[in-house]
């Protein structure tokens, strides 16, 4: 079994969660598996091909799990992007569309310096709305986006279309 197959074997589908008709990708078995976590970080780092990264931006909240470990492995700082009102210092905000309404993401205004090389990470790429909002925040701060990477991608939702012009990598 290769690394990708091993990772896939540690993700379980939960039907009708959080609501009927949704199949939730539960990564908690993967998080509890030391070898699986190591494989995720290995594949994400290998895919970068030695590109310099100054900051890893993790999206709330499941992007924090691997984002922090990825930053450590790359020798980069970690920057959390959170929902409105969750960060204690001065922030920049970005509104994005949800299925029924809108939400707001925030980043500390001093989190990324102009010209810093930034890797954006989350666990899953679905519609691309959240990732697109994070791209806008990073660009407003002057960051240079190296890549967006994800543990998995729901291809049928066409999330990559919102991220055109930026390299996107997904393990699964």
Give the label of every model feature segment:
Residues 1-172:
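PRPP-associated nucleotide enzymes
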């Amino acid at each position: 079994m290769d690394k990708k197959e091993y990772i896939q074997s540690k993700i379980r589908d939960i039907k009708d969660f959080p609501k009927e008709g949704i199949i939730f990708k539960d990564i908690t078995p993967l998080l509890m598996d030391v070898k699986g976590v190591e494989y995720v970080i290995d594949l994400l780092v290998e895919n970068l091909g030695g590109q310099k990264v100054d900051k890893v931006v993790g999206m709330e909240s499941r992007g924090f799990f691997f984002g922090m470990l990825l930053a450590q492995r790359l020798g980069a700082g970690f920057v959390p992007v959170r929902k409105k009102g969750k960060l204690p210092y001065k922030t920049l905000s970005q509104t994005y569309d949800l299925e029924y309404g809108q939400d707001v993401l925030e980043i500390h205004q001093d989190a990324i310096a102009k010209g810093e090389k930034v890797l954006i990470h989350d666990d899953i790429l679905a519609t691309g709305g959240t990732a697109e909002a994070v791209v806008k925040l990073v660009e407003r701060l002057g960051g240079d986006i190296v890549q967006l990477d994800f543990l998995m991608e729901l291809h049928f939702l066409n999330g990559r279309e919102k991220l055109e012009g930026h390299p996107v990598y997904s393990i699964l």
